[in-house]
Amino acid sequence: MKYKRVFLLVLDSVGVGEASDAEKYGDQGANTLGHIVEKTDLFIPNLKKIGFLNTLNMNEDNEVEAYYTIAKPNNAGKDSLNGHYEMMGIESNITFKTFNDGFPTEILDSIEYITGRRIIGNKCCNNSNDIINELGEKELNYGSLIVYTSADSDLQVAAHEDVIPVSTLHEYCEKIRAITLKEEWRVGRVIARPFTGKVGNFKLSNTGRKDYAVKPPEKTILDNLNENNYNVI
């Protein structure tokens, strides 16, 4: 069968069951889609039509208009970056570091040196809104950088747009990206997280967010398509 176009859509973190190595990361019982379905009625007629919900039990449905399956990852690690690499044809044994107890002093000292700003936060927080509302007032008062991480291999830097302009925050994150490529740290992504608002009602600015990921270690499917004169957007 020949296709004229391929649309690749990624619903990041919408899993349909735990991976075989879930125990290694404390993710036993993970099933984002399944747990959502347990709690609420999803109105997703188009996704349902192509078998999205059928992936939960891999049951057959004659009304489904597409092929569906579950893929088992081979790449090491559990973060988004490794998963995206694998979807694009890169098999990698590289594992990016995670920092569940915060970042080592050496990283923080380096960030303070290259930015000239004090670091606050330095903890693992999976909800960015929580940490900006916890530390946002202090950031406003002192012009500090809120640095934190999540369960993934990332280093997130939050700052209020009225204190540190988005362009400046991006410059900081580019510099941080460079120093966190060291083997002993190897952070998968550095993420700029500007926010706006007033004390008690801070809001993340999605338009100013910018991710600085480690570049793919080799060519991807997209590169191969492009080199063979297929348009890639």
Question: Which role does the model predict for each range below?
Answer:
Residues 1, 75-79, 135-139, 178-182, ...:
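A general structural signal for short secondary-structure junctions and capping/turn motifs
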Residues 7, 85-86, 144-146, 188-190, ...:
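Structural motif
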Residues 8, 45, 109, 113, ...:
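A broad, structural surface signal
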Residues 3-17, 87, 225:
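Beta-strand elements within well-structured catalytic alpha/beta cores of enzymes
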Residues 13-160, 164-167, 193, 201:
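Active-site nucleophile/metal-coordination loop of metallo-enzymes that catalyze phosphate/sulfate
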